[in-house]
Amino acid sequence: MDEGIRASGGIRACQTGKQKQGRKRPVTGKKRIVVGMSGGVDSSVTAWLLKQQGHEVIGVFMQNWEDDNDDEYCSIKQDALDAMSVADIVGIDMEIVNFAKEYKDRVFSYFLKEYSAGRTPNPDVLCNAEIKFKAFLDYAMELGADCIATGHYARKLEQDGTHYLMKAVDHTKDQSYFLYRLQQHQLAKAIFPLGDIRKTEVRRLAEEAGLPTAAKKDSTGICFIGERPFREFLQRYLPTSPGQMVTPDGKVVGEHIGLMYYTLGQRKGLTIGGSRDGNGEPWFVAGKDIPGNKLIVVQGHDHPLLLKPTLSMADLSWTLPDAPAPGEYSAKNRYRMADAACTLSPIVDGQASLTFQEKQWAVTPGQSAVLYHGDICLGGGIIQ
């Protein structure tokens, strides 16, 4: 972070493991809550709401990436400045804490490993489990926090000592999918103030409070890539290996620039027209032949190879103390898809399978399958 940001009044910048503040406990019965401030409207309103409720609120801006803070696509400096402006208006202290090493070691290395193996990972899921609700949570506890708060759209219910992760009231913005790897000890120390509020109301509250992020556009895409072209970014870290695009029967219809740049169900960017075999339908990625370095493509959105009745998942993680029993549930195998009715198999050797009532489109290895019982997020695993 540059000196202009460090010098801002009331703001501290530090590396993790260094210069932790020894803050005295407030005399009141209100909680000390450390809020993860991203510079967006959701975390801004989260901090404002908690301050309005009378809690002692401390803001922390997490700097998770620093390889290219000065390039045209990186928004981290502006995001930090926006977070500072919000902290000023809300009337809270804020710190800028560098988690870049933890992020590279725990999240980005996994991201590269998965892509190099031809899979499509979801680093935001791992970022939540390893950074926001582990490294950041640990840091907050050293500040004497009772709990942490984030701007995620999710809810938490505590009953008889068990913490249940639940979907947000606003199902169109629900982010429980990205939080499925949180475990009981993490949920016990986390709150989600926006879980009962719709996004339109969040923006209205931000406007009423005079927060500068009220109209700020929501961030999209993978956090450390930002708005930059994905292929351009990945080429910095992984070598390309061009090969053939083939149909399921082996007919060559084009060339790919590297298997890692494609994901199942992808239509755009294949650079092959719909007339190669005469039917005119668009082409979709249906699979990857990793040993042969071939990309398997098919024509038609509903081609049989794009529709799967089952999926297997490993690296399982459950939000409740015990794994769910085999039986009937619903699941998502990608964010923003509707819940699909399914049956969970018995868990054997850390793996399980889901069988769906209706075939699922473009089930993608490396992505997460997340299991639900009604609004309760039970956890899930990585699609194999």
From Swiss-Prot:
GO terms for cellular component: cytoplasm. ATP binds at residues 36-43, 62, 151. Residues 122-124 are annotated as: Interaction with target base in tRNA. One of its GO terms (molecular function) is tRNA-uridine 2-sulfurtransferase activity. The record marks 152, 367 as: Interaction with tRNA. Catalyzes the 2-thiolation of uridine at the wobble position (U34) of tRNA, leading to the formation of s(2)U34. PANTHER family: MITOCHONDRIAL TRNA-SPECIFIC 2-THIOURIDYLASE 1, TRNA 5-METHYLAMINOMETHYL-2-THIOURIDYLATE -METHYLTRANSFERASE. This is tRNA-specific 2-thiouridylase MnmA. It comes from Chromobacterium violaceum (strain ATCC 12472 / DSM 30191 / JCM 1249 / CCUG 213 / NBRC 12614 / NCIMB 9131 / NCTC 9757 / MK). The lineage of its organism: Bacteria, Pseudomonadati, Pseudomonadota, Betaproteobacteria, Neisseriales.
